[in-house]
Amino acid sequence: MNLFLAGLDHTTAPVEIREQLAFSQTDLPSALMQLTSSETGTPPLFAEAVILSTCNRVELYGVTNPGTTAQHVVDFLAAFHRRPAASFVHTLYFYQGEAVARHLCATAAGLRSLVLGEAQIQGQVRNAYEAAQRIGSVGSILHRLFQIALVAGKRVRHETTIGKGAASVSQAGVELARRRLGDLRGREVLLIGGGEVSELAAQNLIANGADRLTIVNRTSARAAALAERYGAEMLDFGALPQALARADIVISSTAAPVPIIYRHHVAEAIAHKQRARACGECDPPTMLLIDLAVPRDIAADVAQIPGVHLFTVDDLREVVSHTIELRSAVLEIAQQIVEEQVQEFLSWMRTQEALPVLTMLRQRAEEVRNEELARALRRLHDLSPEQRAVIEGLSRSIVNKLLHPPTRCLREAAAHGQGKRYASILAELFNLEH
């Protein structure tokens, strides 16, 4: 078995491809089961699996079974998403072994994010791990890897300043609106969605002076809670056309699998604005739409409407590129922390080499203990239960004390890359089948 990663992110694939391979929350159980189950009678691709799917990345982490290749994973992605492999294979990256651990630790630390040091990825990594754990596709190796990666993210944020003042995708979207339109006071802002991205957008809009905020979401309770928290107006999802008609700025971030805003929606909104101005010869009204969702919420051809300016998450680079320079001074420290966590994982992995021999040694010791204990008890008559318990405890204590030094020695040797050598010596000394 081998640690394996196949993925794509904002550096290798545009949003048009990322959205095609994104896994929704409803997709995850089926996808993870297909990766780790053997319903067809053939061995599954992975013994363990976690899928990390966000607006900027889709990554499959796994412990492969013998015979699994990168092509098998490409074929899985193509079949699951019903897309020809040729349309996306050139955007994929593949890592094995140590490189997987290094990539995940850096990802959890925000070092591979579009917005350098952003904190949301930490929660997204945790959510991906917990979702796989609930489904039962996490074993000991991915459990340890993700726990160590989450520690890496936490340490980087606590031991460096990389996260201080770090933007989020939401903040970058608001900054884009501010740069394009200037003062946000008096602007009609429509937020579509009720999740974390929308909440962060609301926070940043208010911080930047926005004072006319409307929130629309399919789940009215979520929208109502956000609206109350930030002093916004809440509208039912069915009122989206009316909300668009009065909006100057639209920021959308739902989990819809297909667009919720099409060209005719925006065209009608622009026409309504034009009529309201009672100026048939004036330039068309402007509308700024920022689509932070993957898959996208807003159809791409909306951008063809005069007066409409449509941006996606990929367009945020112009806003956040300066953060790389601003935070490059602490990158070296962050990368050092990541490397320390990677080495901790690798050390743990090496200790796993010792487990088979240690298990056999413990089993052999138990066999001898049980044989000798039974022989002794047969020779001792009329023992009370308390006396038998004392002798039983004595035998266990002797075995544990005798096994502790070689066990500790082998684990330490394995942690330093000498596990196979010491395991072979131990197996020969104790006549173990190894």
From Swiss-Prot:
Which InterPro entries does this one have? Answer: 4pyrrol_synth_GluRdtase, 4pyrrol_synth_GluRdtase_dimer, 4pyrrol_synth_GluRdtase_N, GluRdtase_dimer_dom_sf, GluRdtase_N_sf, NAD(P)-bd_dom_sf, Shikm_DH/Glu-tRNA_Rdtase
Reaction catalysed by this enzyme = (S)-4-amino-5-oxopentanoate + tRNA(Glu) + NADP(+) = L-glutamyl-tRNA(Glu) + NADPH + H(+)
- Name the enzyme group at the top EC level: oxidoreductase
The keyword Amino-acid biosynthesis belongs to this UniProt entry's keyword annotation: no
Binding positions for substrate? T54, C55, N56, R57, S113, E118, A119, Q120, Q124
Source taxon at top rank = Bacteria
Pathway connected to this protein: Porphyrin-containing compound metabolism; protoporphyrin-IX biosynthesis; 5-aminolevulinate from L-glutamyl-tRNA(Glu): step 1/2; Porphyrin-containing compound metabolism; chlorophyll biosynthesis
Q: Which Gene3D superfamilies match?
A: Glutamyl-tRNA reductase, N-terminal domain (3.30.460.30), NAD(P)-binding Rossmann-like Domain (3.40.50.720)
Instruction: Identify the residues that bind NADP(+).
Output: G193, G194, G195, E196, V197, S198
- Name a Pfam family for this protein: GlutR_dimer
Spell out the residues of the site Important for activity. Answer: H103
Instruction: Name the UniProt key words of this record, in alphabetical order.
Output: Chlorophyll biosynthesis, NADP, Oxidoreductase, Porphyrin biosynthesis
Quote the catalytic residue positions: C55
**The keyword Ribonucleoprotein is assigned to this record:** no
Family of the protein in this entry: Belongs to the glutamyl-tRNA reductase family.
User: Domain comment?
Assistant: Possesses an unusual extended V-shaped dimeric structure with each monomer consisting of three distinct domains arranged along a curved 'spinal' alpha-helix. The N-terminal catalytic domain specifically recognizes the glutamate moiety of the substrate. The second domain is the NADPH-binding domain, and the third C-terminal domain is responsible for dimerization.
Q: What else is known?
A: During catalysis, the active site Cys acts as a nucleophile attacking the alpha-carbonyl group of tRNA-bound glutamate with the formation of a thioester intermediate between enzyme and glutamate, and the concomitant release of tRNA(Glu). The thioester intermediate is finally reduced by direct hydride transfer from NADPH, to form the product GSA.
- Please describe the quaternary structure of this protein: Homodimer.
Its name, as the record gives it, is Glutamyl-tRNA reductase
Q: What is the lineage of its organism?
A: Bacteria, Bacillati, Chloroflexota, Chloroflexia, Chloroflexales
The gene name reads hemA
